[in-house]
Amino acid sequence: MSTYAYFKISIDGKIQPTIYFELFDNVVPKTVKNFASLCNGFEKDGRCLTYKGSRFHRVIKNFMLQGGDFTRGNGTGGESIYGEKFEDENFELKHDKPFLLSMANAGPNTNGSQFFITTVPTPHLDGKHVVFGKVIQGKSTVRTIENLETKNDDPVVPVVIEECGTCTKDQIEAPKPDVTGDSLEEFPDDYEGDKSETAIFKIASDLKGIANKQFAQQNLDTAVAKWQKALRYLMEYPVPNDDSKESPDFWKEYNALRYSIYANLALVALKQNKPQEAIRNANIVIEASNSTELEKQKAYYRLGCAQGLLKNFEESEKALAKAGNDPAISKKLAEIRQKKKDYKKRQQKAYAKMFQ
């Protein structure tokens, strides 16, 4: 019978979905006992050894997250329940997939309290580190930590184990939808449901609908997060598979969904005064070989607006000239041309003063 454990983690003070682990005590009981005891808190020599309050001090994207140094917090400390270090129990389990829980060490037989969670298969660690568990829920939290900004592999914001302990399988809380009603894994690699072309299209469409609703409510950051999530799922099929049974019309809809999301991201970037992001998203649509003329025109309009914010009036004018003949576009183009004239006048006056 497996042991189960959990971490309630905060990132920069904000509580994340709980991570639950299944521990393999039928394979490595001594290693599991050490981890489980440190989750619950272990009294030793008048001290309580515990992961509670400790942080993840090392994060490497496409590799792993490391924590468990509750004495120094920088990867040089930690202590096991058996003493400072204990031996490698066995290497029966392999690092053959993401979300495995394994012991960090400084060489053979130097296990303490530090552990790591893999985010990809890491076979080069086989025979060197003891695998003793896996993440069974809360994978989105692992991915969120993995994608944090770091400096020298140390997250720039604190990632803290606020609460931890062991539990029974029945005590594991079912995944809860977030405030938008979305309960899907953040990354499609972690999603274990139907990944057919039509299923992915529906998932992305639903996520776009959630994002659009958040946008209408002026929850711009949430809208952006959901649109970006939809794009991650759509990237399961960046181009149709050679053996795809779906019709050309289906793939037109698929691409239209993708490009509408990029256009929306460009729009929000403009609202948030992030012109470079708007330019990046607009250019994806413009440079795509299979985007429609109408999609390109919409993107050119947003590109023109973004260049205008950067006072790149020549580039703004060029983009807006390709955005179609809508009255709103003509008005924006006239506005940019006037701003360009005013800007040149100010420059001329400034230069004239320099030589007086």
Swiss-Prot record:
Pfam families: Pro_isomerase (PF00160). It is an enzyme of class 5 (isomerase). Residues 328-354 form a coiled coil. It catalyses: [protein]-peptidylproline (omega=180) = [protein]-peptidylproline (omega=0). Its EC number is 5.2.1.8. Residues 6-166 form the PPIase cyclophilin-type domain. GO terms for molecular function: cyclosporin A binding; peptidyl-prolyl cis-trans isomerase activity. Belongs to the cyclophilin-type PPIase family. PPIase D subfamily. PPIases accelerate the folding of proteins. It catalyzes the cis-trans isomerization of proline imidic peptide bonds in oligopeptides. This is 40 kDa peptidyl-prolyl cis-trans isomerase. It comes from Schizosaccharomyces pombe (strain 972 / ATCC 24843) (Fission yeast). The lineage of its organism: Eukaryota, Fungi, Dikarya, Ascomycota, Taphrinomycotina.
